[in-house]
Design a protein with these regions (language model features):
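C-terminal, charged low-complexity interaction regions
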Residues: 144-199
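Intrinsically disordered, low-complexity boundary segments flanking structured domains
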Residues: 49-53, 74-79, 113-121, 125-126
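A structural signal for short, well-ordered beta-strand segments and their strand-loop junctions
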Residues: 49-50, 62, 90-91, 129-132, ...
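Short, charged surface segments at domain edges that flank catalytic/cofactor-binding sites
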Residues: 3-50, 72-83
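Long, low-complexity, intrinsically disordered segments enriched in glycines and aromatic residues
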Residues: 101-160
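Histidine-centered nuclease catalytic patch
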Residues: 53-106
Length: 199
């Protein structure tokens, strides 16, 4: 999972909210959605906020709401909050477009549905509680966050080879670091590890 840093909302979304103060997400025009997708795609460096898979085009971005649009308690549901850009995430389709896909083979918001999340993708402290194993699987020692990544979002889904893909990326990064730091001090090696971790 990546830490999402939201910039200023697209102007088209701001104007839509101003002109339509009682609107919610369902009322958003397709042109505004396209602007939202494109901005999130760029801000997230073309990665799904949850599984970190590459998203090839802005049109392939699914607009996810970190806070569910239809929570169980509709009484306290604030429909205007569904247009709040700071709570929107760009995610992949989580294998949901595959015909006949089983629910256990879906990931990200396709698997999440309307469940609340303990993890906050906008909070670095929260995201840093996710740990990576050598086999590419992820977990957290925080029980609620662990439930989010392993069950609610299904981020260790074997159907999409998510752990194997992470392992491959990890091995590539390790190889690059070793090559870059060959013959250098331990401090240089640690510095490169930190730089890679933060990127």
């Amino acid at each position: 999972m990546i830490v999402v840093k939201r910039g200023k909302e697209p102007n088209s979304l701001l104007q839509f909210r101003k002109k339509n103060p009682d609107a919610d997400y369902e009322d958003m025009p397709s042109s505004v959605r396209a602007d939202v997708r494109e901005q999130m795609w760029n801000e997230q460096k073309h990665l799904c906020a949850y599984c970190m898979r590459r998203i090839d085009n802005p049109s392939d971005v699914r607009i996810e709401h970190c806070r569910p649009r239809h929570p169980k308690d509709e009484v306290v549901h604030d429909k205007k909050a569904t247009l709040d850009f700071k709570w929107m995430l760009g995610v992949c389709y989580g294998n949901s477009l595959v015909k006949g896909v089983k629910p256990e083979d879906m990931t990200c918001d396709a698997h999440r549905r309307n469940k609340e999340l303990a993890i906050n993708p906008f909070d670095e402290v929260s995201v840093r509680k996710i740990k990576y194993k050598a086999d590419g699987s992820i977990y957290s020692e925080d029980a609620e966050i662990n439930k989010d990544v392993t069950d609610t979002l299904n981020l260790n889904c074997p159907a999409l080879s998510l752990p194997q893909t992470r392992k491959k990326v990890l091995l590539q990064a390790q190889k690059r670091i070793v090559q870059k730091c060959e013959g250098k001090s331990q401090g240089a090696y640690i510095h490169e590890l930190e730089r890679t971790y933060k990127s």
